[in-house]
Amino acid sequence: MTGVQTCALPISPVVANSVAVNRLLNPSTAALPITAVETPSAPARPTGIGEFDRVLDGGLVPGSVTLLSGEPGIGKSTLLLQLVGAWSGTSLYVSAEESTQQVRLRAERLGVRRDDVLLMSALSLSDIVAAIDKNVPSLVVVDSIQTIADDALDSAPGSVVQVRECAFRLVQEAKARSIAVLIVGHVTKEGSIAGPRLL
């Protein structure tokens, strides 16, 4: 028998969400000559923080995911709060390590008082995606990738599977919605990204 056949057996959520299955179900486009590839319609958007924009070659590109890593306590969260405060548009700051009250206190000290800066304390990837659906931000900050988890996976936050799947899903969301996503990754004393070095 030829052709595609359907399977009567259900696919488990873990298999359905795996990177390998997603690659099979959503194959990449064919190779094209570089001159045939469309250039992005939206150039890099300045963040409002000059030095940060210089490092990023002009700002954040819609549809991209940027990893900001550094040792704990170095000021990553503070820098990102300043960034959402300077961002021109709605931003969603997801803290998986602190409560919204703690983040608000730090934001107050930095002078970030805008109604279009949305705060969320969440550990679940599905909650984060639902908030993106509901609020349609142009910038999403996830602090940090090692502490969020996909509830469909049977592994702890920060594990190889969780970090891979959560990062992969955030990349998909960024591309599908043409939004900029910033992910925080902690660095160990040895200088490597905490958890699996898969990002």
Annotated model-derived regions:
Residues 63, 71-74, 78-172:
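Conserved inter-motif catalytic segment of the P-loop NTP-binding fold
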Residues 42-49, 73, 96, 156, ...:
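Conserved phosphate/pyrophosphate-binding and hydrolysis machinery centered on Walker-type P-loop NTPases
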Residues 2-9:
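Short, small-residue-biased leader/transition segments that mark boundaries at the very start
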Residues 46-52, 119-123:
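Short gly/ser/thr-rich secondary-structure transition/capping motifs
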Residues 15-42:
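Charged, amphipathic alpha-helical linker segments immediately N-terminal to NTP-binding catalytic cores
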Residues 44, 55-63, 72:
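Phosphate-binding P-loop
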Residues 164, 168-199:
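Phosphate-binding/switch region of NTP-binding enzymes
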